A protein has these predicted regions:
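Hydrophobic Val/Ile/Leu positions in short beta-strands of Rossmann-like dinucleotide-binding domains
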Residues: 5-6, 71, 156
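General beta-strand structural signal in soluble alpha/beta enzymes
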Residues: 57, 130-134, 179-182
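N-terminal Rossmann-like NAD(P) cofactor-binding subdomain of oxidoreductases
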Residues: 98-105, 109-112, 135
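Active-site-lining helix/loop region of Rossmann-like oxidoreductase modules
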Residues: 152-221
């Protein structure tokens, strides 16, 4: 499975790229500059030299050629980036992972985008793409450390059944992670906003906690 990450040179994009490559996926780290994307890929390959990560850099446009595309650009630029690539993203699963947040004093607060959530704004920017939301609650530092096991549920939301299924399958390939169907994109507003709460807890507890849902019945039961 090939993964393309738009804005893959930032902390979240780099972290996800390394983690997905560590489980055998081929990952294209996209950037506005293909050279910068390759610099980041080289940095990660060198950092984890013993793991033979299949990482390469590219422009964002080339990253769109992957089977699944992840939008990891900063939240305020994500819709614009996706809109510029909308034709290339037609029919593809596009995972929005950014959170609209800003710092107020020592706290993080959620920004409510005009469309209600960043996921919805990304879907509007590429109306023929199959947009899902995922990976919002995984701390980048923990995700980036391949020697640190993960223990997290990942809430997945989408208006497209196929996108939900594909995204959950992707999440489930990461050891320690479990993809959970959280419903339609209307859930994204709450999912994204909760990240501010989680970051606040982690700051106060000096931790890198994610989330786990308890009491869930097995599917089909």
């Amino acid at each position: 499975m090939d993964i393309g990450i738009l804005g893959g040179t930032g902390p979240a994009g780099k972290a996800l790229a390394a983690r997905l490559a560590s489980v055998g996926m081929s990952v294209s780290i996209g950037s506005r500059s293909a050279e910068r994307g390759e610099e980041t890929a080289t940095e990660l390959r060198d950092k984890w030299a013993g793991r033979a990560l299949d990482l390469h850099g590219s422009s964002n446009a080339v990253a769109c050629e992957a089977d699944i595309v992840v939008a990891a650009t900063p939240w305020d630029g994500a819709p614009h980036t996706v809109a510029a690539l909308a034709d290339r993203l037609e029919g593809k699963v596009v995972i929005s992972m950014a959170n609209a947040l800003f710092k107020v004093g020592d706290d993080m607060e959620a920004v409510v985008p005009a469309r209600g959530s960043l996921c919805v704004a990304v879907q509007d920017a590429a109306p023929r793409a199959l947009v899902s939301g995922a990976f919002h609650h995984l701390p980048a530092r923990g995700l980036a450390n391949l020697e640190e096991p993960l223990d997290a549920d990942v809430l997945v939301c989408s208006d497209h059944v196929a996108a939900t299924k594909t995204t959950i399958e992707l999440v489930d390939r990461i050891p320690g992670c479990r993809g959970i169907d959280a419903g339609s994109l209307s859930a994204a507003a709450a999912i994204e906003a909760f990240t501010a709460v989680l970051i606040g807890v982690n700051i106060r507890r000096r931790s890198h906690a994610s989330i786990r849902l308890t009491g869930l019945r097995a599917e089909g039961v």
